UniProtKB/Swiss-Prot annotation:
Protein name, per record: Trigger factor
Classification of source organism: Bacteria, Thermotogati, Deinococcota, Deinococci, Deinococcales
Single annotated GO MF: ribosome binding
Catalytic activity: [protein]-peptidylproline (omega=180) = [protein]-peptidylproline (omega=0)
Gene that this polypeptide is encoded by: tig
EC number: 5.2.1.8
Biased composition (Low complexity): 415-443
Length: 449
């Protein structure tokens, strides 16, 4: 039985009383497990008396196991009974005695109450970039550049040439330099030189990785000069790119640019809407919620570093030496708060809209996500695990609510709208989900959903 003691804002405390019969049942379950798992010389498995088992594992061990079992069952059950969604809790158990009732007190912070502003009155200003003839021609020029060839010439080096140089000295070697993207000090030193010339290049002081490099001079010899040859924009160029004609290339390229522009416009409108949704939200966020997200984000960073062979302690010391650790931790806390606010706003939006995800929608999107990552649906499910699947379900629900709200603002018919497709929905939800265990998932666990 659960009894609410106090509730002030997000702060709450309640007391839970567990009947003696439940306590005895928990003791019986723990003793049965010990009898099965603990081997006692002279006794067959499961036949050792409790006193003998207690002498092997200790009375304190048995009590801890029983207490943990009771708390795991009756704490979430009490939270559901009182309709509380706890973000953070401190449990204060009273003494545990076999054959007697067991009580404990819970003090913590509840999942916050969220109130959204009138999001239907939001005016979105973001638009898709216009694909003009100038944009199309610039993209065609980029295609020419990417498909350029180089021809060896006998003349002084010019600004757009590719130059092969040999670094003189014991550790020298030959390598190409593309002058149109080279550093200014390299470009200035080489322009006007000829094959066979020896050139001194002064390299400014700079930092590379963890190391500071002072200003120094490198001596090189010019081995060859090649000039860039651009193919003319004609049908032959188009056919080299597997298009039947230049007109077809221009038509298909414009269509692709317009598709990307629509995606860019949609992404900008999404971000603008979510930002305004968060700005109009009224909520008192428990610090524990932000702290938990910050810790999860830090663990993700540590995992990423580990995959690159870098220990977090080494990276932390490096940032401390550079005087950047405090800034890093401050930015991490700000990002954690921002993510929590987005999650709360989108979860409340889904609740207000009554958004539900059908089994077919979830299955289709999971299949699309698996395919996009080169996995079978079964492999993806094993990789995510139960918590990950539940968190992803919540992310998809948020995404569906976001799409529905945007469609409403656009004056579009929401029912049956399938423009985004399962794969795009999966990608968008994955970007919004942030961490494997989202705030909404943990609230759902407390609510018993």
């Amino acid at each position: 039985m659960a009894e609410l003691i106090s509730k002030e804002g997000n702060k709450v405390s309640f007391r839970v009383a567990v009947p003696a019969a439940e306590v005895n049942r928990a003791y019986d379950q723990v003793w049965a497990g010990l009898a099965r798992d603990v081997r006692v010389p002279g006794f067959r498995p499961g036949k050792a008396p409790r006193k003998v088992l207690e002498s092997r594992v200790g009375k304190g061990y048995v009590e801890n196991e029983v207490r943990d079992r009771l708390l795991q069952v009756h704490y979430p059950q009490a939270a559901r009974e009182l309709k509380l969604s706890l973000v953070d809790a401190r449990i204060e158990p009273e003494p545990l005695v076999s054959g007697q009732p067991f009580s404990f007190t819970v003090r913590g912070e509840t999942y916050p109450e969220v109130t959204l502003g009138d999001w239907r009155a939001v005016q979105l200003t973001a638009t898709a970039p216009e694909i003009t003839d100038e944009v199309l021609n610039r993209t065609l020029s980029d295609l020419q550049e990417r498909n350029a060839t180089f021809q060896t010439v006998e003349r002084p080096i010019e600004a757009t040439d590719q130059v092969t140089i040999e670094e003189l000295g014991e550790e020298g070697g030959s390598y190409p330099v593309y002058l149109d993207v080279a550093e200014p000090h390299v470009r200035d030193a080489l322009i006007g030189k000829n094959v066979g010339d020896e050139v001194e290049i002064t390299v400014p002081a700079h930092q590379h990785g963890d190391h500071e490099h002072p200003e120094h001079t490198v001596r090189v010899r010019v081995q060859s000069v090649q000039t860039k040859q651009l193919q003319p924009l004609d049908d032959e160029f188009a056919r080299s790119l597997n298009f039947e004609s230049l007109d077809r290339l221009r038509t298909d390229l414009r269509a692709e640019l317009e598709r990307r522009a629509r995606q860019e416009g949609d992404a900008a409108r999404r971000e603008e809407f979510v930002n305004q949704l968060v700005e109009g939200m009224q909520v008192e966020i428990p610090q524990a919620l932000i702290d938990r997200r910050r810790e999860a984000m830090l663990e993700e960073i540590q995992d990423d570093l580990g995959r690159q062979g870098v220990k977090w302690s080494e990276y932390e010391n490096f940032m401390r030496e550079q005087g950047k650790l405090d800034e890093f931790l401050s930015d991490l806390a700000k990002n954690a708060e921002s993510r929590v606010k987005r999650d709360l706003a989108l979860e409340k939006l889904a609740e207000d809209l009554g958004v539900q995800l059908s089994d077919a929608e979830f299955s289709n999107t999971m299949n699309a996500l698996a395919q996009a990552n080169g996995l079978t649906p079964q492999q993806l499910q094993r990789q995510l695990g139960p918590n990950g699947i539940n968190a992803y379900y919540i992310s998809l629900t948020r995404e569906k609510a976001l799409q529905q709200a945007l469609a409403t603002l656009n004056g579009q018919q929401v029912a049956g709208r399938q423009e985004a497709g399962a794969e795009q929905t999966a990608q968008a939800a994955e970007q919004e989900s942030g961490q494997p265990q989202a705030e909404g998932e943990q609230a759902a666990e407390q609510r018993g959903e």
